[in-house]
Amino acid sequence: MIDLSPLVRRLAGTPLASWSQGLQAQLDAKLEKGHGDLDRWRGALEALPALQPSEIDLVNGLRLDCDCDDATRAQMRQALMGLSPWRKGPFDLFGVHVDTEWRSDWKWSRVGPHLDLQGKRVLDVGCGNGYYQWRMLGAGADMVIGVDPNWLFFCQFQAVQQYLPELPAWHLPFALEDLPANLEGFDTVFSMGVFYHRRSPIEHLLALKDCLVKGGELVLETLVIEGDENQVLVPEDRYAQMRNVWYLPSVPALARWLRRAGFSDVRCVDVSVTSVEEQRSTDWMRYQSLSDFLDPNDHSKTVEGLPAPRRATLLARK
């Protein structure tokens, strides 16, 4: 069982205290339903060697280290491989380099400098395996809760957390819809790589706003296209082989949507074209990746002939 009592204690006296009281039962109910591969992934977690990190770096990346021998490293590598595919990272865990599909550290280096997370209560919606949660703590966040219903990501988070049990980061295998309305308890809310999967983009923005305290900040990172405030791409079918991509607005259109949803002080802090160096297949993620989804003769287009992935990060205030 995963014990959430430290989280409940952490949230005592905050606007999230009443919500926290029901989290253990909510988590236990989710775990009871489970997933067909959960036992296998738990086996991988149990196979991780018992180590105590003497070096912890969450500022320059995600690196844990201590004195350990080659046999222990081999055990670590085999156990972590049992949790493949690894999407977000990279992680350096006691001499084992988990070379993930995404160079998420590149994204963080673009986004992080624009944020003030010092002492903030943070929610990361669609947090994946929690890579960014650890980086948020490295940037001074007081605590970080991530929500993502993907069970493999949940187990990957547990793999890192078991070496950092005292740090105030929690991963809940919930969807945003599992959170109560009008939560209004987080200083900063992240939605990175989620927005374009939502069929109702304005509803998503309103739900994110509901999670923020008054004056809190939204960090929204999503796929965009070039164009003016009236330009929005709605793929006819797939986008970069993904069926679940609905809306790719231009940056000015997205800024307008944020204002329409009631946000203020909207500003774009980064726009980057995703390269095949930033997202690619590795030993830790052996499936198809970005290069397979782009036109082989013209990387400015997807295989469907649509504009290649371009990502923007916008900040907005409640």
From Swiss-Prot:
What this protein is reported to do is described as: Catalyzes carboxymethyl transfer from carboxy-S-adenosyl-L-methionine (Cx-SAM) to 5-hydroxyuridine (ho5U) to form 5-carboxymethoxyuridine (cmo5U) at position 34 in tRNAs.
Q: EC number(s)?
A: 2.5.1.-
Q: Which HAMAP family match?
A: tRNA_carboxymethyltr_CmoB
Q: What is the lineage of its organism?
A: Bacteria, Pseudomonadati, Pseudomonadota, Gammaproteobacteria, Pseudomonadales
Q: Where does carboxy-S-adenosyl-L-methionine bind?
A: K88, W102, K107, G126, L176, E177, M192, Y196, R311
Q: Which domain of life is it from?
A: Bacteria
Q: What is this protein called?
A: tRNA U34 carboxymethyltransferase
Q: Please name the SUPFAM superfamilies in this protein's record.
A: S-adenosyl-L-methionine-dependent methyltransferases
Give GO terms: molecular function aspect only: methyltransferase activity; transferase activity, transferring alkyl or aryl (other than methyl) groups
Question: What UniProt keywords apply to this chain's record, in alphabetical order?
Answer: Transferase, tRNA processing
* Homology family: Belongs to the class I-like SAM-binding methyltransferase superfamily. CmoB family.
Q: Which gene encodes it?
A: cmoB
